Amino acid sequence: AANVNLRHGVEDVRQLPMEQAVTFMGQIRSAGRQEMRLPGRYWRNNKMDLATCLKKMELVGVLAFATVDSEGAPQIRNISAIHYEPDALYFFTARGKNFCKELMEDGRVQILAYTKYKEMIRLSGKAYAVAENEQKKWMDIIFEEQPYLANVYPGDTREIGIIFCIDKAEVEYFNLGVNPIFRETYILGNVSVKEKGYYITESCIGCGTCMKHCPQKCIEKGTPFVIRQEHCLHCGNCYENCPVKAVIRK
């Protein structure tokens, strides 16, 4: 952020490309000025997208993978042996691990990344084992990108490994470090997204109770009133306090 220093305000930061702005915000926090926050519309105008989410996941490096075991209980572990393509994720594990067993039996997985800028990225999809004739290709790529793996699986011992792929997923971006908060959902591959959150129906009487109870002030007047979905926390305050039950939950 060469053209901005710590004396400048939010208006100056808004003019920066996203990556420079992120760097600058890190400088602000290091200097103890955590009260300065970029507005949610900054991130919207700078077009957060799937590619940026995947890049942020790659930069975080170690991601939390959640699966379901044979008894229906959630299991979670950290995974870093991951290779990123624009349209897919490939990752390595060993065939003898419970993680592999869960992926082979069920396949459903959620991956969570959390950045130092209070951004959360959650990928929900289904993993499958890569075709046998593609296993070596992706394994070699992952071992080249993650040199530590050679210490974990030296020489031919890597052959106990198996490569899984996720190429269809819902990717949710949720940023608590901006005001108002910012959220958006992206698609990896050909999948449909289930609608989430709260919506105001035609039963709205325009009393404004929902606006008063919204912590992010993301409800706008109208007929009916409208919730700005990209800034909604999904806290349910509007839903619980509407006097005529005009707010519905998807």
Listing of model-derived features with the role each one plays in the protein:
Residues 43, 126-194:
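Charged, gly/pro-rich active-site loop segments
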Residues 209-226, 237-250:
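Iron-sulfur cluster-binding cysteine motifs and their immediate structural context
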Residues 29-47:
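Short, Lys/Arg-enriched N-terminal segments with co-localized hydrophobic residues
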Residues 109-136:
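Helix-adjacent hinge/juxtasegments
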Residues 55-72, 109-113:
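A short, Trp-centered hydrophobic/proline-enriched beta-strand micro-motif
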Residues 2-16:
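Extreme N-terminal basic, low-complexity initiation segments
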Residues 82-118:
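A short mixed-secondary-structure module that forms the rim of ligand-binding clefts
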